[in-house]
Amino acid sequence: MQPATPLVLCVLLSQVLLLTSAEDLDCTPGFQQKVFHIDQPAEFIEDQAILNLTFSDCKGNDKLHYEVSSPYFRVNTDGSLVALRNITAVGKTLFVHARTPHAEDMAELVIVGGKDIQGSLQDIFKFARTSPVPRQKRSIVVSPILIPENQRQPFPRDVGKVVDSDRPEGSKFRLTGKGVDQEPKGIFRINENTGSVSVTRNLDRETIATYQLFVETVDVNGRTLEGPVPLEVIVIDQNDNRPIFREGPYIGHVMEGSPTGTTVMRMTAFDADDPATDNALLRYNIRQQTPDKPSPNMFYIDPEKGDIVTVVSPALLDRETLENPKYELIIEAQDMAGLDVGLTGTATATIMIDDKNDHSPKFTKKEFQATVEEGAMGVIVNLTVEDKDDPTTGAWRAAYTIINGNPGQSFEIHTNPQTNEGMLSVVKPLDYEISAFHTLLIKVENEDPLVPDVSYGSSSTATVHITVLDANESPVFYPDPMMVTKQENISVGSVLLTVNATDPDSLQRQTIRYSVYKDPAGWLNINPINGTVDTTALLDRESPFVHNSVYTALFLATDSGNPPATGTGTLLITLEDVNDNAPFIYPTVAEVCDDAKNLSVVILGATDKDLHPNTDPFKFEIHKQTVPDKVWKISKINNTHALVSLLQNLNKANYHLPIMVTDSGKPPMTNITDLRVQVCSCKNSKVDCNAAGAPHFSAATALLLSLFSLARL
């Protein structure tokens, strides 16, 4: 039997090796189940096993190491998942990373409410045990690689391994993708012989959460033998980001007297960590309230939603009794669901207690006194009120109304926007002789309506007693203006009218004296006692001081008061026209060519300062008594113009032609004007009047000049 023992051992050893080889061929490295659904209990109990995870690297699991994405759970060496403390984590996802020198894999654990999935936890696990894991028939075996972010030195460090059971001898592994040969380059690399994947530096999940890499085998010439096969690298989140309030400033408003539980505002923070983990699960609380009166807890914040609500009775939200209607809250957001290990961030919430019109304005006293001189206008008294509401709102701003004692609308009242006082003004002069006293009833209200349970009381009305002081009023002309119509040129000393001024101070015995104030032409005089106005010069309608036939003068009436008062009256004198102005012609100079075929010389016009009918039609004539020559002719064009023409051509010279023009007044007025006619040479379209410099007279004129010269000898 002994000789057979080595043979038997060899046979047994070959069978063991064969079985082991067969087992290796049937083994797939990794978790036997990739996804687990866990019913949410009322609470995970510390150190209580939740489930068992089965991982195999097909090499005996030597140096097996587990990592859990949540710091509140761990996996024991036997594969049992346990909670490190009593905790709730509804709807969250956990990742378990298993790794040996030969393989690594990741399992996903979804913690859900009992209604989210069908069946019990035991049924799910039973289904998982009876459901085979599908296998991919390929020689390159890859599993997702999980790498915690923010790892420390040393680098590079192995994070996973790719297995190819059928890799030909001499072939190599090649790794490509973002993070390898694409930006950011050089983060990952693979041992081309062993398939070990390593990371060269620490990772930041908030920058890149996953990397999609590709593995393939290539021959010595770089040609692909198998693949590429996708390899996913998942960066496991760490709680390395504090919550941040990004939407400030945070300002909220709540009306005073609001019921308990009134929502003021919402404050939410942002956490850059993985939202599927407690690293970004935020809880809110109020760290500080300023001021802390009348209660240190005026507000409450929903720890999950961030809604800030009132928690005091409406009576404590009385803006008028608060030291300061503005509250500042330091709001803290903490991740890890508010646990002590969580990171925090803070922001300030400013809450304004807004005013409502729950206080009516009240006069500071029931009666006000005012004194005003008759004839004076403007503000005579300021009415003061008190209102406890917010001075920046319509609940405080006052609106005043005169409700009695102002039938003549002599008074108005307006609100001073700075002081809220009522400024009572006289807008029409008061007459002491008519009424020396006035009594007004004033009402005050707010711009905004009062709240339903508040009304205006007796303190919202006040009486104003106004005393009018007598003043020496100026005499008043009646009528004013005074108007009279007279012919111009009436004789000097003619009486135009008698003016009349009365003194409004009927209770005083005063005398009135008259004087001239403005008399631009100096034509008038007034009797200081009786007011009779007469002329001191001829009244000329054509004077530059007369406008549209009206002359204006001003007179003064001064009483004997102390000090005296003076009134002004206006006199308008309408002057009727008389024919006292002779007409005159225009132009008075003309030119004509010595060889002109058209013998027309000039068209004359006439004007008259008088008014119609003392003006046109005008009569134009050549004063024949001094012009016997029969070389000129004048012809009527219309009522105001005539044409002067030649009967024959004349030599170059200056000719003086007397023109007589007569108006249509009764009696008519006549004016004789010399028309100077220059006869010029007009050769080759050039006008030369130099030879016309010497005057030319008619024969009769020459004879008269000769006789005059002889007489002087």
Swiss-Prot record:
Annotated Cadherin domain residues: 139-245, 246-363, 364-477, 478-585, 584-694
Q: Name one GO molecular function term.
A: cadherin binding
| CDD domains listed in its UniProt record | Cadherin_repeat
GO biological process terms, alphabetically, are:
adherens junction organization; calcium-dependent cell-cell adhesion via plasma membrane cell adhesion molecules; cell migration; cell morphogenesis; cell-cell adhesion mediated by cadherin; cell-cell junction assembly; homophilic cell adhesion via plasma membrane adhesion molecules
State which residue ranges cross the membrane.
Answer: none
Q: Which InterPro entries match?
A: Cadherin, Cadherin-like_dom, Cadherin-like_sf, Cadherin_CS, Cadherin_pro_dom
Q: What is this protein called?
A: Cadherin-13
This protein's species is Bos taurus (Bovine)
Its gene name is CDH13
